[in-house]
Regions:
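Basic, alpha-helical nucleic-acid-binding regions used in initiation and control of genome expression
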Residues: 1-229
Length: 229
């Protein structure tokens, strides 16, 4: 039996709560996770009525496989042959990219919050961060984000603009810092993880266990991880 996600707030499934729910919904839809009999009846009724997202982290689950089947799956999944094939599989690469992007967005949110600026959402900021992650590690992108948010705060103090307008400049400053670094081939000091944003279980599974790189999804660029033997 798998206990409700909300019972273990320190053990994050993915880098953000919205993605947690997306993962759980996918596993339920694919009949990999089954609702445990210990789950309250009204929660399951809400799911049937397409009104379940707010309660999904309160559910208990059972895995729809026997222990031996799970052991065999783990053995196959962690074999060198499987990992080698996964490194070339688009779906696997997309998951790796998604984890790194979500970690970067979470840090951007946290950093803007420190400066009392609203979180910037949208395709544009995601595109900028993805461009950064093509070359740099998440720990280095943290550096771009930190200084980008700091520049946003300074811009807000200098100009008669509202906070949302100032926060929207984050993508401009992050992009500018990245382009300057690439143009002049500057060293980017990697940052440490912050206490409030620990490595997620999904990141640990993919990068530490499957790719055999301790917190590699944070410490190393993805292209480097996928090209290593």
């Amino acid at each position: 039996m798998i206990e409700p996600l909300r019972n273990h707030p320190a053990c994050t499934l993915s880098p953000d709560l919205d993605y947690d729910q997306k993962i759980l919904n996918h596993l339920i839809d694919k009949y990999i996770l089954l609702f445990s009999l210990n789950t309250r009846f009204e929660i399951i009724e809400n799911y049937k009525n397409d009104n379940f997202d707010a309660c999904i982290d309160a559910c208990e689950f059972d895995i729809a496989y026997h222990h031996k089947e799970i052991s065999n799956l783990i053995h196959i999944l962690l074999s060198k042959e499987t990992v080698s094939k996964l490194k070339e599989l688009k779906e696997f690469i997309d998951i790796c990219k998604e984890i790194q992007l979500r970690e970067s967005l979470a840090y951007l949110n946290k950093t803007l919050e420190i400066h009392q600026l609203p979180f910037v959402t949208g395709i544009t900021i995601s595109h900028v961060l993805c461009k950064c992650l093509e070359t740099f590690s998440v720990s280095q992108v943290y550096n771009f984000i930190y200084h980008g948010a700091k520049d946003c705060a300074a811009y807000y103090m200098r100009r008669p603009i509202d906070k949302r307008h100032a926060a929207n400049y984050a993508m401009k400053y992050i992009s500018r810092n990245m382009e300057k670094t690439l143009a002049y081939k500057l060293h980017v000091k990697p940052f440490q993880r912050v206490y409030s944003l620990p490595q997620s279980s999904l990141s640990h599974l993919i990068f530490d266990i499957m790719l055999n790189s301790k917190d590699g999804g944070f410490e190393r660029p993805l292209h480097e991880l996928l090209s290593s033997a």
